[in-house]
A protein has these predicted regions:
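Conserved "HGTGT" condensation-loop signature of ketosynthase/thiolase-family condensing enzymes
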Residues: 1-132
Length: 132
């Protein structure tokens, strides 16, 4: 997961500080969420706003990357990012990052990252730039 995010940053010729929001894969599985939060913290530190959209749309299997990309781009255009639904309490084993929970958040970001992590290490991290 960490490697996928770092390679995406390298391909985009960006530093972690350039990213204003991360759309987490966030499947609400103990092992997956702990691993993803740790990898995200290692790349971005504790101040990166992050949420998962699966609580809004479910896990659409092969379609989740495309749907979450579209939703992330839409949220960026609106300068408002949705919270992770039903995230009332963060697992203490998850890393301390800026989870968007309870209510959405107004954010004006230039770059955002969408992550999808699958069984067997089939991982993608895509970076998008907000259109003018």
């Amino acid at each position: 997961m960490k490697k996928a995010m770092l390679l995406a940053l390298e391909d985009a010729n960006l530093t972690p500080e350039a990213i204003g929001y991360v759309n987490a894969h966030g499947t609400a599985t103990e092992v997956g969420d702990i691993a993803e939060s740790e990898a995200t913290w290692l790349v971005f530190g504790e101040h990166i706003p992050i949420s998962s959209l699966k609580g809004h749309i479910g896990h659409t299997m092969g379609g989740c990357g495309a749907l979450e990309t579209w939703m992330t781009l839409h949220m960026a255009r609106e300068n408002w990012f949705a919270p992770t639904l039903n995230l009332n309490e963060v697992d203490p084993l998850c890393s301390s990052i800026d989870y968007i929970k309870d209510e959405g958040r107004q954010l004006d970001v230039e770059y955002m990252m969408c992550n999808n992590f699958a069984f067997g290490g089939v991982n993608t991290s895509l970076i998008f730039k907000k259109s003018g």
